[in-house]
Curated annotation (Swiss-Prot):
Protein function: E3 ubiquitin-protein ligase which accepts ubiquitin from an E2 ubiquitin-conjugating enzyme in the form of a thioester and then directly transfers the ubiquitin to targeted substrates. Ubiquitinates ERBB4 isoforms JM-A CYT-1 and JM-B CYT-1, KLF2, KLF5 and TP63 and promotes their proteasomal degradation. Ubiquitinates RNF11 without targeting it for degradation. Ubiquitinates and promotes degradation of TGFBR1; the ubiquitination is enhanced by SMAD7. Ubiquitinates SMAD6 and SMAD7.
Highest taxon in the source lineage: Eukaryota
Name this polypeptide is given: NEDD4-like E3 ubiquitin-protein ligase WWP1
Keyword DNA-binding part of the UniProt annotation: no
Species whose genome carries this gene: Homo sapiens (Human)
Gene transcribed to yield this protein: WWP1
Length: 922
């Protein structure tokens, strides 16, 4: 339970806040029932900080019973907002209510312990403010001392000054407050002098982000004489300055010394002085005597008379100036304390964000860094230009120098940066002189190679390196990957991939040669066309690279760039789409390369690969569902998918396409299959291949036939008046698009109809889906670089992503193993009889029940993947004949009980396949 005191410890929370336990219990909402279901959650807003509860599935009577911990002050106002979460739209506000902690503390005798509040929810609409329901919350764990509210026992006055204006919360100031003499400047600046009078039970004066300008001389209190001095960091100090602004709760113990202090002329007359106030020490401490500069203190009577003449209530500029001249005439020249003036100038500088100035019991000034929870005697300076403060994943503060692209743990200052620059300049000059002396007549081989590089500079973010065996490789800092292929030549249309086992290297002079790792030989001749890098000509060399080699090369890239550990994905089957979207988009793209550990809520299954396969299969079926308007079928007779131009109706459609791109890349990276594939033109666009008119035939036969007719016939004889412009209708809105600049005024003729056909083909593939395609490819490229797919064509990419759909029964039987059964067991014979009699759909359902997916890899059942690599289909004898069959998707194993008849086996298998959903543990 948090207890507040006037000098509460602020080591954990630098702003003096206290912890309050807020339990959001339930709500009763006046709204229509939503047949599609919705999720209700509550936001608690405390001084701009938002804390959310979990989502409740009830739409009218949601219950949470969730405890939230918030940091508050006695003046905090708690705001509760009840929201309705929507999947494809922005969340809707259902109502809001507020609690004033100050009133609640006064009502409940400064104690909030298990206080139950029934809040009326309201919402502003076009007809006014309407009541939308009730919210039940419980406040607990906050006890405030009386001094923290009234701040004094005998005088309830609390003075809060903000921007120079005095605000009195509890009425006019009491007559028992200490009389204070002040000289006001032109801008209402407080240049006060504490008197020797000491008044007990006086109220504190708070200065908030402004100049301390009391409306009358009797509004500032002195600190009690016997109050113990605070310690640094253990309790609140006497004088606090946050970001250069003073918050003086009371003077130090020196206030009881007899005598009238001398006021600094700079503080009294400077019109641009900040709100920082420093208590003036007594005259006996200010006036000193030395050999070079002797200052003789005046008598007490003279000082008092001067103080009366100076500190009259009518403090105009002229009178205050003449008064100070009179005070200075009493002293020799130069008697003003230089230390005092210097400290005044230092305090006018603004502290960096998160820093606070305090004083210890000995009056020494120190500084608190609330960002790192450390203290220092040196005054912090603002960061030099080009520097930035950051926090790493372990909450450690470090500093980034964008000028040199370096980082450091130590906070930089202008002096340290200046010293480092001088040292670095001298070091560079010395190294340059030494290098110029040592290599006077030598040329840099790397510089010569870079100048002679026929491909020019590398793309942005790429770097060329050499390993220990002098093999050149390339680093992509954008995706944190490495590869052997040169990115400048990778994916060129006019250059085909190398044969298996071959590699391109460059000499020191930049001449390209080829390495055959099969025979461990090198040659200047290109094995693809026989042309030499040195001499032109030579015979053509035919070669063929199979799909298996490409797939093995892709798997090698994935394994070499995989990260250790695993990433958990906790989803519910009822909200699979939204849960997966929130978690995948919250992770860093490179974290998605870690091994996946999927958890279905409410199910106790352990993921050794089987749950991940089912998650990919189920989620792909969900996200590619045309019902969400993100994708549509490519044609009437083609059930492959393509991006829906009407997907812009969803305001967050680009975020969803980026998520789908990440998800598809994860499926390729982890070797999992999805349920439904895309159209072949979409795969070609992923591979950056040019789309032709022939690709239109598979997605829009009518459009394709129209363009073919235009190509094969004379359109001028037919009298067709066509222009380089086309209309498109999306959701009933018709828009016109020019195929080229000014196309609506350019007539299509026999001479330019080929250009028209090409532009129409390009427009048909990209109409209304440019932004969606870019978002999809950006999300895909964040996980799997598109360069890794350069060797594949669109059909091979489809097989990699969707697998094989046809089931070869002979291959299935040939690659099945048995445990406690034999090939001639009657249950095994009945099982294969059941598989032969069913259609392909039931076989797919059976395959999904056992392996987690209904798709097969390219190699068929021989390449089924288990938890630790390839694992064949297995049938094991388990249980009694009254049991249902069970499956272990991580190991591709079917537990088949010893049934006594074929009819019993068929009935149990069909029931398990069609009715079972979920995982458990044995």
């Amino acid at each position: 339970m948090a207890t507040a005191s006037p000098r509460s410890d602020t080591s954990n929370n630098h702003s003096g806040r206290l912890q309050l336990q807020v339990t959001v219990s339930s709500a009763k909402l006046k709204r229509k029932k939503n047949w599609f279901g919705t999720a209700i959650y509550t936001e608690v807003v405390v001084d701009g900080e938002i804390t959310k509860t979990a989502k409740s599935s009830s739409s009218s009577n949601p219950k949470w019973d969730e405890q939230l911990t918030v940091n508050v002050t006695p003046q905090t106002t708690l705001e509760f907002q009840v929201w309705s979460h929507r999947t494809l739209k922005a969340d809707a506000l259902l109502g809001k209510a507020t609690i004033d902690l100050k009133q609640a503390l006064l009502i409940h005798n400064r104690k909030l312990e298990r206080v139950k509040e029934q809040l009326k929810l309201s919402l502003e609409n076009k007809n006014g403010i309407a009541q939308t329901g009730e919210l039940t919350v419980v406040l607990d764990g906050l006890v405030i001392e009386q001094e923290n509210i009234t701040n004094c026992s005998s005088s309830p006055t609390i003075e809060i000054q903000e921007n120079g204006d005095a605000l009195h919360e509890n009425g006019e100031p009491s007559a028992r407050t200490t009389a204070r003499l002040a000289v006001e400047g032109t801008n209402g600046i407080d240049n006060h002098v504490p008197t020797s009078t000491l008044v007990q039970n006086s109220c504190c004066s708070y200065v908030v982000n402004g100049d301390n300008t009391p409306s009358s001389p009797s509004q500032v209190a002195a600190r009690p004489k016997n109050t113990p001095a605070p310690k640094p960091l253990a309790s609140e100090p006497a004088d606090d300055t946050v970001n250069g602004e003073s918050s003086s709760f009371a003077p130090t113990d020196n206030a009881s010394v007899t005598g009238t202090p001398v006021v600094s002329e700079e503080n009294a007359l400077s019109p641009n002085c900040t709100s920082t106030t420093v208590e003036d020490p007594p005259v006996q401490e200010i006036l000193t005597s030395s050999e070079n500069n002797e200052c003789i203190p005046s008598t007490s009577a003279e000082l008092e008379s001067e103080a009366r003449s100076i500190l009259e209530p009518d403090t105009s500029n002229s009178r205050s100036s003449s008064a100070f001249e009179a005070a200075k005439s009493r002293q020799p020249d130069g008697c003003m304390d230089p230390v005092r003036q210097q400290s005044g100038n230092a305090n006018t500088e603004t502290l960096p964000s998160g820093w606070e100035q305090r004083k210890d019991p000995h009056g020494r000034t120190y500084y608190v860094d609330h960002n790192t929870r450390t203290t220092t005697w040196e005054r912090p300076q603002p960061l030099p230009p080009g520097w930035e403060r950051r926090v790493d994943d372990r909450r450690r503060v470090y500093y980034v120098d964008h000028n040199t692209r370096t980082t450091t743990w130590q906070r930089p200052t202008m002096e340290s940066v200046r010293n480092f620059e001088q040292w670095q300049s001298q070091r560079n000059q010395l190294q340059g002189a030494m290098q110029q002396f040592n290599q006077r007549y030598l040329y840099s081989a790397s510089m010569l190679a870079a100048e002679n590089d026929p491909y020019g500079p590398l793309p942005p973010g790429w770097e060329k390196r050499v390993d220990s065996t002098d093999r050149v490789y390339f680093v992509n800092h954008n995706t944190k990957t490495t590869q052997w292929e040169d990115p400048r030549t990778q994916g060129l249309q006019n250059e085909e991939p190398l044969p298996e086992g071959w590699e391109i290297r460059y000499t020191r002079e930049g001449v390209r040669y080829f390495v055959d790792h099969n025979t461990r030989t090198t040659t200047f001749k290109d094995p693809r066309n026989g042309k030499s890098s040195v001499t032109k000509g030579g015979p053509q060399i035919a070669y063929e690279r199979g799909f298996r080699w490409k797939l093995a090369h892709f798997r090698y890239l994935c394994q070499s760039n995989a990260l250790p550990s695993h990433v958990k994905i906790n989803v519910s089957r009822q909200t699979l789409f939204e849960d997966s979207f929130q978690q995948i988009m919250a992770l860093k793209p490179y974290d998605l390369r870690r091994r996946l550990y999927v958890i279905f809520r409410g199910e106790e299954g352990l993921d050794y690969g089987g749950l991940a396969r089912e998650w990919f299969f189920l989620l792909s079926h969900e996200v590619l569902n045309p019902m969400y308007c993100l994708f549509e079928y490519a044609g009437k007779n083609n059930y492959c998918l393509q991006i829906n131009p009407a997907s812009t109706i969803n305001p967050d459609h680009l975020s969803y396409f980026c998520f789908i791109g990440r998800f598809i890349a994860m499926a390729l990276f982890h070797g999992k299959f999805i349920d439904t594939g895309f159209s072949l033109p979409f795969y070609k666009r992923m591979l950056s291949k040019k789309l032709t008119i022939k690709d239109l035939e598979s997605i829009d036969t009518e459009f394709y036939n129209s363009l073919i007719w235009i190509r094969d016939n004379n359109i001028e004889e037919c009298g067709l008046e066509m222009y380089f412009s086309v209309d498109m209708e999306i959701l009933g809105k018709v828009t016109s698009h020019d195929l080229k600049l000014g196309g609506s005024n350019i007539l299509v003729t026999e001479e330019n109809k080929d250009e028209y056909i090409g532009l129409m083909t390009e427009w048909r593939f990209s109409r209304g889906v440019q932004e969606q395609t870019k978002a999809f490819l950006d999300g895909f490229n964040e996980v799997v670089p598109l360069q890794w797919l350069q060797y594949f064509d669109e059909k091979e990419l489809e097989v990699m992503l969707c697998g094989m759909q046809e089931v070869d029964l002979a291959d299935w039987q040939r690659n099945t193993v048995y445990r406690h059964y034999t090939r001639n067991s009657k249950q095994i014979i009945w099982f294969w009889q059941f598989v032969k009699e069913t259609d392909n759909e039931v076989r797919m359902r059976l395959l999904q029940f056992v392996t987690g997916t209904c798709r097969l890899p390219l190699g068929g059942f021989a390449e089924l993947m288990g938890s630790n690599g390839p694992q064949k289909f297995c049938i094991e004898k388990v249980g009694k004949d009254t049991w249902l069959p069970r499956s272990h998707t991580c190991f591709n194993r079917l537990d088949l009980p010893p049934y006594k008849s074929y009819e019993q086996l068929k009935e149990k298998l069909l029931f398990a396949i069609e009715e079972t959903e979920g995982f458990g543990q044995e």
